[in-house]
């Protein structure tokens, strides 16, 4: 996937699900299912419900995404 094809949007983690999957509410009100990006997994960055995160969505599937950053 080319880097310029992704849509980046901020959101808030609503629920933690099994297998490092999270339900995230985006700033526009949509709820998407997200998994953690590989670099975040590699560096053991923990994500809890209530955290503000940056999510990447593809134009092909707007109901699934990848968490790429956790704001402090």
UniProtKB/Swiss-Prot annotation:
* Cell location: Cytoplasm
Source domain of life = Bacteria
Cysteines engaged in disulfide bonds, as pairs? none
**Signal peptide stretch:** none
Query: Mind listing the GO molecular function terms for this protein?
Result: ribosome binding; rRNA binding; translation initiation factor activity
- PROSITE patterns in UniProt: S1_IF1_TYPE
Query: What range(s) does the S1-like domain occupy?
Result: 1-72
Q: Which GO terms describe its cellular component?
A: cytosol
Question: What's in the keyword line of the UniProt record?
Answer: Cytoplasm, Initiation factor, Protein biosynthesis, RNA-binding, rRNA-binding
Query: Which segments does the entry list as coiled coil?
Result: none
Annotated family: Belongs to the IF-1 family.
Subunit field text: Component of the 30S ribosomal translation pre-initiation complex which assembles on the 30S ribosome in the order IF-2 and IF-3, IF-1 and N-formylmethionyl-tRNA(fMet); mRNA recruitment can occur at any time during PIC assembly.
Q: Which PANTHER family match?
A: TRANSLATION INITIATION FACTOR IF-1, CHLOROPLASTIC
Against HAMAP family, the record matches this protein to: IF_1
Descriptive protein name: Translation initiation factor IF-1
Q: Which organism is it from?
A: Sulfurovum sp. (strain NBC37-1)
Lineage here is: Bacteria, Pseudomonadati, Campylobacterota, Epsilonproteobacteria, Campylobacterales
